[in-house]
Regions:
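Conserved catalytic cysteine-centered active-site region
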Residues: 1-5, 17, 54-107, 118-120, ...
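Buried hydrophobic positions in well-ordered alpha/beta secondary-structure cores of metabolic enzymes
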Residues: 7, 33, 44-47, 89, ...
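Short beta-strand segments
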Residues: 7-8, 108-114
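Short polar catalytic/cofactor-binding loops
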Residues: 9-14
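Metallocofactor- and cofactor-centric catalytic cores in central/energy metabolism, strongly enriched
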Residues: 20, 24-27, 43-49, 55, ...
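Short catalytic helix/loop segments, enriched in acidic residues and glycine
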Residues: 20-37, 68-73
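Phosphate/pyrophosphate-binding loops at sites that engage ATP/ADP/AMP, CoA/4′-phosphopantetheine
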Residues: 31-45, 169-172
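Conserved residues at the C-terminal ends of beta-strands
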Residues: 50, 83, 111
Length: 172
């Protein structure tokens, strides 16, 4: 493996952007990152696009990165979509690092984008529920719906499934 450096970074300010699309949020961060690296899209060899919930919130499945990057000058290059729940962007960054470290690419781009707001507040909540082990919930509760499966007062379905012993979760 060879040494790798991060040549540039960019970020859209965290916040709620009800009228913005993932594409518009990505364009802002991408423009900043490429400018910081002092390169253009032509110099990028491969892209790793991290996103977990776009399909559930917008209906856009399978080609989320390709759609978000349509106007970026990156189409025609490999755009690999990475879905790994809350670690999607971190996983994309790891894969970009590995691509350069292994010699597969000289310049790789990692992008993470998520928009967890929706006019119907139950939609992002359902997206978070989809990140739970639904098969395990069914086996333990007999319910197909984690919202109605029930938890003890002061607890959540996440605690029932993922906290293996009392006190396993730190006090907040």
């Amino acid at each position: 493996m060879r040494g790798v450096m991060i040549g540039g970074t960019g970020m859209t300010r965290f916040g709620k952007y009800p009228d913005a699309s993932i594409r518009s949020l990505v364009q802002e961060a991408l423009h900043e990152a490429l400018g910081d690296a002092r390169i253009g899209p032509a110099e990028v060899e491969t892209v790793f696009f991290g996103n977990a919930a776009a399909g559930l919130l917008t209906g856009q499945e399978m080609i989320t990165g390709q759609v978000a990057l349509r106007d970026s000058g990156l189409l025609g290059k490999p755009i690999i979509n990475v879905e790994n729940a809350c670690a999607s962007a971190s996983s994309a960054a790891h894969l970009a690092w590995l691509s350069v470290a292994s010699g597969q690419a000289e310049v790789a781009l990692a992008i993470g984008a998520e928009k967890m707001t929706h006019a119907d507040k139950s939609v992002p909540f359902r997206a978070l529920i989809a990140a739970m082990d639904l098969e395990e919930i069914r086996a333990e509760t007999g319910s197909d719906d984690p919202l109605t499966a029930g938890s003890a007062p002061g607890r959540s379905g996440f605690m029932d499934i993922y906290a293996e012993r009392p006190g396993a979760l730190p006090a907040v």
